[in-house]
């Protein structure tokens, strides 16, 4: 059966159920109630899911009172007779002539020509009515116009239409649908064709009916095998658009075949259509019944007789198309031949007309342009072959611009098109569709018809998936994608379709419950984008199919709760407990966080396979996309632990990242993170990016939020393939997800899926989006959800039975009930203030960080352990030699002390990751952790020699030093994530200058300083921030000590500014060995790197440990007298050396200088004990280089008097004045200010 209905051949059953539901809901299976409550039986004008409420097919209005005209007979003898439509003039009913019945005869003589052996049958019922009507039709003086019409445009457009319907909602459009609609449109131009003749008061009258009622001649087989013909009317056709016309047409045909037509259906036919062409008749002159003005007969579509023996190739070469003969048989009393001829010419024009098919395509929701009628182009086949190749390339490049990827279709007046995708632009026409062209291996063929080429290209690039991949530079990757995209579409199995439907059921049931139970609470629902659940499920399933180890998900807050429940498997009861605000006291350390920021872990088990895979969702803040680099770092850490390499079997932990469309285009960290994708220090073997594109950012429309065509354009920078997919087509989304994983596995690169959908509610559940997007939300408010539209499509295409649909509906209701049942069992906890996390991790007592002198010697030797044929740069070689000397003789500088600390860790089997801009050499040419061959460029890393012991056995240690991209936000986020993923590694990131760390402020605020308190997420990442006032200007001076101290609380991190190489050594050693997982912020020196006073003896490494407060060496060595000190200068960092030089120069025994090496947590007891060593101190000053409103003073000025009120209640500050910038831009001004600080300190 032909039907554009969403339910195809099953539409009648659904509509019958809907009718019963309207009359008595209890008469319909309860599983259908929720589905039918907002069901509209008319077809929508969208695919795959309708927008807005579909318009109902109009019903005939009450007919004005008038006397009936004479009853005409049905077309071609159809029974029962049709009734004339109303007119403005009353026509009195004619009284039938009285007839007297003849007396019965004993036997009737056989008619002439009938022998006694012939079989005779008395015609009764419908057959008798045919005889009567045919006889009556002899009284109608008719004439017939005949016109041969090219059928090619209609044939080709019907192919396009039905291919679209087959892929979307099912059903077919017949030629009679198109022809009937063209007749109705032609009648509007020639209304006289809709008139009929009558006699009123004995006078001839031309009756013009109020409406066009098109009579369809329907051939019906009887139970006895005989055929009968009925003519039923489609009423009020002139008021219908194409979708309504098809619905009314199919309703009449279906009821005729089911024997459910009523007398009203036969009444009022004004013009008829009969199509004997369906049985091969080429030319027909049907009889015209009384009460009608015309009947149109359609013949079979055939090639002209002289070409019917030609081959298909020859016909295509000559440009010969099929013809259809139309006849118009009309009542010559009221219609003239010219009118009938013009009427047929109009139908002819319509069936070739662009606008006619444009309307039909729009009504059926076909998003691209129809086949256009054009004159054949006489160019040679060779010229056209080149154009076909160009056309294929155009579709590969720009096919996505014509893809039907927007489920809302807000602009229904515009076809998705592009000049490059128009065959006419390439000098090709519909006459070329059946011609063969060389295609150079396209779809695995050497030659293909243009029709097949176009069909495959549109299926591949222009349906519900738009693909961008031609920006990829590697031909192998392009070819791999083409081989999988340019193939015949294969539907999922029924089992897979049911599984997809079950995931949609779960997604919608979850959101429905939350909306019902927690009205108005913020949850950032997934409604409108539920397809992301089966999409993610499919991607994870494919990862399991490849035998991978884990999928780690990072995502924003929208849809997060649904993902936690339906992907990660977090129990409903736990999620709803968080909704109730009932935090478990045993877990409520720190501040906690809102429910849609929390993470979880689970295991995914395949539905159609035997594998399982770990799945985790990382915690995130509301700072959109800030989690991106954190996820990548965490995954890299897990991969490094597994250590499966970079080959085909490597990268077995998969990062899956969800984004919003506005954020993906708008947040710079997206580009920063993408830029890391292929760098050796940051590769994770490809990320699966899924953009939940609801086409709005809070209240901002796409045209206000990005300059690019797509939100995904930024991903082209790394050569990632991009798939745009319609979120209302779950099967397409699932197919793309699997392909994305396969591509990632093959090429170890990122893949981007842009799933276009919508947001059913506002940005949050308390927001009203219609204030700013009224048109969009008018569409959304009446749009059926994807679960229902997918169910319709499955039934309409015949993929599942009505019984299976009922089972799916019961599954949905069962899942909803399951959620309701779980929430009744919620565990209740009393609410109490949250406790601090500070005491959760304590420094172990008696921990030693000293090392044996022999180990220091090994590290020194390693710096001269390069191969004999290695060409060390002449400026680097003296540095390496000096380091070996320091390892044996002392006077260790800062850079070598750092390498000694790292070397000892490697010897102890620890993994070290050290990154940053210019980190391997060092911004200040101080580190040289990796040596480059002056001639060949090969690398030598001295510390790698410490990963084996003196006997050559591996220690298990790894040293990974990388120069990072020029990024702070993504780079710091990555290292934080790495430290979370591998808590046993020592992870260091160094800023080029400390000033630039503010580029990573979101990571510092949201993760480093508060991740433990909010999520219980532990990290011991180390930030090294070069800091110090040296006259280099405001942007090369300050690591912003004040900001870190402001963020510090609850022991959230350690903030230090060591002043000696040995103390820095012990600080790093303590951090790596104490078992406390909290970030370490170190403000490192610049000019002090080469200060000859800033060196340490070997015994400081072999006998000491980290000291949070340092006195001057003269006091600790016993040469100074503490009792003489009356003025105590507290300071930190490199300023100490300037103060010490001034003291030494002036011999000021009355001044003592104390260094606070650890700024937070404040070493209160050690500081108090040290101050007690100076019994005669009278004045206390905090001396800093930084302006008064910066550095440590804004915090210490408040804290020191509180913690040590006996001594420091009156502590004063010595510093630069308060400044908005960190320093002066003039080196001369700097020198003056610096001198003033020193002078005031000793005043």
From Swiss-Prot:
* InterPro entries the UniProt entry points to: 2-oxoacid_DH_actylTfrase, 2-oxogl_dehyd_N, 2oxoglutarate_DH_E1, CAT-like_dom_sf, DH_E1, KGD_C_sf, ODO-1/KGD_C, THDP-binding
Spans annotated as Disordered: 22-118
Q: Which residues bind thiamine diphosphate?
A: 558, 622, 624, 661-663, 694
Biased composition, class Low complexity, residue ranges: 47-58, 101-112
Q: Where is this region: Succinyltransferase E2?
A: 104-353
Region Linker: list its residue ranges: 41-103
Q: A Pfam family this protein belongs to?
A: E1_dh
Q: Where does acetyl-CoA bind?
A: 1054, 1070, 1105, 1108, 1158, 1165-1166
Q: Name one GO biological process term.
A: tricarboxylic acid cycle
Give me the stretches of Pro residues compositional bias.
59-71
Q: What does this protein do?
A: Shows three enzymatic activities that share a first common step, the attack of thiamine-PP on 2-oxoglutarate (alpha-ketoglutarate, KG), leading to the formation of an enamine-thiamine-PP intermediate upon decarboxylation. Thus, displays KGD activity, catalyzing the decarboxylation from five-carbon 2-oxoglutarate to four-carbon succinate semialdehyde (SSA).
Protein's UniProt name? Multifunctional 2-oxoglutarate metabolism enzyme
Q: Which organism is it from?
A: Mycolicibacterium vanbaalenii (strain DSM 7251 / JCM 13017 / BCRC 16820 / KCTC 9966 / NRRL B-24157 / PYR-1)
Gene name of the encoded protein: kgd
């Amino acid at each position: 059966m032909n039907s554009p209905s969403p339910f195809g051949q099953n539409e009648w059953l659904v509509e019958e159920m809907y009718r019963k539901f309207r009359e008595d809901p209890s008469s319909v299976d309860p599983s259908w109630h929720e589905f039918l409550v907002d069901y509209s039986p008319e077809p929508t004008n969208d695919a795959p899911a309708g927008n807005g409420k579909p318009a109902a097919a109009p019903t005939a209005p009450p007919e004005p009172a008038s006397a009936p005209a004479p009853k005409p007979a049905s077309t071609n003898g159809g029974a029962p007779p049709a009734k004339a439509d109303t007119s403005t003039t009353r026509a009195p009913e004619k009284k039938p002539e009285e007839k007297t019945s003849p007396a019965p005869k004993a036997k009737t003589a056989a008619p002439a020509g009938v022998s006694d052996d012939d079989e005779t049958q008395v015609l009764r019922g419908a057959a008798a009515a045919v005889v009567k009507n045919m006889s009556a039709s002899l009284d109608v003086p008719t004439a017939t116009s005949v016109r041969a019409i090219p059928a090619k445009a209609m044939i080709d457009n019907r192919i396009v239409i039905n291919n679209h319907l087959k892929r979307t909602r099912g059903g077919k459009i017949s030629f009679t649908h198109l022809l009937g609609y063209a007749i109705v449109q032609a009648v509007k131009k020639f209304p006289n064709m809709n008139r009929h003749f009558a006699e009123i008061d004995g006078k001839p009258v031309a009756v013009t009916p109020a409406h066009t009622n098109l009579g369809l001649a329907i051939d019906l087989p009887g139970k006895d095998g005989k055929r009968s013909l009925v003519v039923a009317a489609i009423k009020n056709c002139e008021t219908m658009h194409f979708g309504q016309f098809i619905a009314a047409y199919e309703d009449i045909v279906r009821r005729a075949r089911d024997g459910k037509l009523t007398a009203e259906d036969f009444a009022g036919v004004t013009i008829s259509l009969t199509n004997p062409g369906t049985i091969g008749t080429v030319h027909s002159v049907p009889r015209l019944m009384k009460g009608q003005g015309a009947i149109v007969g359609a013949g079979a579509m055939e090639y002209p007789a002289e070409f019917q023996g030609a081959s298909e190739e020859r016909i295509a070469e000559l440009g010969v198309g099929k013809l259809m003969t139309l006849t118009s048989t009309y009542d010559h009393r009221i219609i003239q031949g010219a009118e009938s001829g013009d009427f047929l010419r109009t139908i002819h024009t319509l069936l070739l007309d662009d606008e006619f098919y444009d309307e039909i395509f729009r009504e059926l929701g076909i998003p691209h342009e129809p086949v256009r009628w054009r004159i054949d182009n006489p160019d040679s086949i060779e010229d056209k072959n080149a154009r076909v190749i160009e056309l294929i390339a155009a579709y590969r490049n720009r096919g996505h611009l014509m893809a039907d990827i927007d489920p809302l279709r807000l602009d229904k007046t515009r076809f998705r098109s592009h000049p490059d995708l128009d065959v006419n632009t390439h000098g090709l026409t519909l006459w070329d569709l059946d011609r063969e062209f060389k295609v150079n291996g396209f779809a695995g063929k050497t030659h293909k018809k243009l029709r097949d080429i176009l069909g495959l290209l549109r299926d591949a690039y222009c349906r519900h998936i738009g693909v961008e991949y031609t920006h990829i530079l590697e031909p192998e990757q392009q070819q791999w994608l083409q081989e999988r995209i340019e193939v015949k579409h294969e539907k999922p199995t029924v089992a897979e379709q049911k599984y997809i439907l079950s995931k949609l059921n779960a997604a919608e049931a979850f959101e429905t419950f939350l909306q019902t139970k927690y009205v108005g609470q913020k949850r950032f629902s997934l409604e409108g984008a539920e397809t992301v659940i089966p999409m993610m499920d499919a991607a994870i399933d494919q990862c399991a199919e490849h035998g991978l180890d884990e999928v780690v998900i990072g995502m924003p807050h929208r849809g997060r709760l649904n993902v936690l429940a339906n992907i990660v498997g977090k129990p409903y009861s736990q999620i709803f407990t968080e909704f109730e605000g009932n935090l478990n006291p045993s877990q409520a350390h720190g501040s906690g966080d809102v429910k849609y920021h929390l993470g979880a872990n689970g295991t995914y088990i395949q539905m159609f396979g035997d594998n399982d895979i770990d799945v985790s969702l990382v915690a995130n803040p509301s700072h959109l996309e800030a989690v991106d680099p954190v996820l990548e770092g965490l995954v890299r850490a897990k991969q490094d632990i597994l250590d499966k390499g970079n080959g085909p079997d490597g990268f077995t932990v998969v990062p899956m990242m969800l984004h919003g469309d506005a954020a993906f285009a708008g947040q710079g960290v997206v580009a920063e993170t993408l830029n890391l994708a292929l760098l050796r220090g940051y590769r994770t073997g490809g990320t699966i990016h899924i953009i939940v594109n609801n086409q709005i950012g809070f209240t901002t429309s796409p045209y206000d939020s990005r300059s690019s065509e797509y939100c995904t354009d930024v991903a082209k920078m790394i050569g990632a393939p991009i798939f745009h997919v319609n979120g209302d087509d779950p099967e397409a989304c699932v197919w793309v997800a699997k392909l994305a994983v396969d591509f990632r596995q093959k090429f170890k690169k990122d893949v981007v899926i842009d799933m276009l959908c919508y947001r059913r509610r506002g940005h949050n559940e308390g927001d009203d989006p219609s204030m700013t997007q009224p048109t969009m939300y008018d569409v959304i408010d009446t749009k059926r959800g994807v679960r229902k539209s997918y169910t319709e499509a499955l039934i309409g295409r015949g993929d599942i039975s009505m019984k299976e649909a009922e089972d799916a509906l019961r599954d949905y209701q069962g899942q909803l009930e399951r959620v309701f049942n779980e929430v009744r069992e919620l565990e209740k906890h009393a609410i109490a203030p949250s406790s601090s996390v500070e005491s959760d991790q304590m420094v172990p007592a008696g921990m030693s960080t000293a090392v044996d002198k022999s180990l220091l010697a090994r590290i020194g030797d390693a710096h001269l352990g390069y191969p004999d044929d290695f060409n060390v740069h002449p400026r680097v070689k003296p540095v390496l030699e000096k380091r070996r000397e320091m390892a044996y003789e002392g006077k260790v500088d800062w850079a070598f002390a750092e390498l000694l600390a790292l070397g000892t860790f490697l010897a102890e089997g620890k993994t070290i990751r050290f990154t940053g801009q210019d980190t391997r050499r060092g911004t200040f040419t101080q580190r040289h952790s990796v040596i480059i061959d002056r001639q060949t460029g090969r690398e030598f890393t001295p510390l790698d020699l410490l990963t084996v012991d003196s006997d050559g056995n591996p220690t298990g240690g790894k040293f990974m030093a990388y120069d990072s991209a020029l990024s702070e936000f993504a780079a710091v986020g990555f290292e934080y994530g790495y430290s979370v993923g591998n808590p046993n590694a020592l992870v260091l990131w160094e800023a080029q200058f400390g000033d630039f760390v503010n580029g990573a402020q979101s990571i510092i605020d949201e993760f480093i300083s508060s991740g433990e308190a909010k999520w219980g997420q532990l990290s011991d990442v180390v930030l090294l921030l070069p800091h110090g006032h040296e006259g280099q200007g405001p942007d090369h001076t300050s690591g912003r000590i004040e900001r870190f101290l402001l963020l510090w609380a609850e022991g959230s991190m350690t903030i230090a500014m060591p002043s000696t190489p040995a103390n820095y050594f012990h600080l790093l050693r303590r951090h790596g060995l104490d078992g406390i997982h909290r970030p370490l912020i170190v403000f490192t020196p610049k000019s002090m790197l080469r200060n000859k006073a800033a060196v340490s003896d070997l015994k400081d490494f072999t006998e000491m440990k980290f000291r949070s407060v340092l006195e001057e060496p003269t006091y600790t060595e016993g040469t100074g007298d503490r009792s003489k000190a009356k003025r105590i200068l507290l300071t930190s960092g490199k300023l100490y050396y300037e103060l010490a030089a001034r003291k030494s120069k002036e011999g000021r025994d009355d001044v003592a200088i104390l260094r606070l090496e650890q700024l937070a947590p404040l070493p209160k007891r050690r500081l108090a004990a040290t101050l007690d060593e100076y019994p005669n101190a009278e004045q206390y000053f905090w001396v800093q280089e930084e302006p008064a409103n910066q550095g440590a003073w804004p915090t210490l000025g408040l804290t020191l008097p509180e913690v040590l009120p006996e001594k420091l209640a009156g502590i004063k500050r010595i510093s630069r004045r308060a400044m908005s910038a960190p320093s002066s831009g003039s080196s001369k001004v700097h020198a003056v200010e610096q001198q003033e600080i020193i002078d005031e300190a000793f005043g």
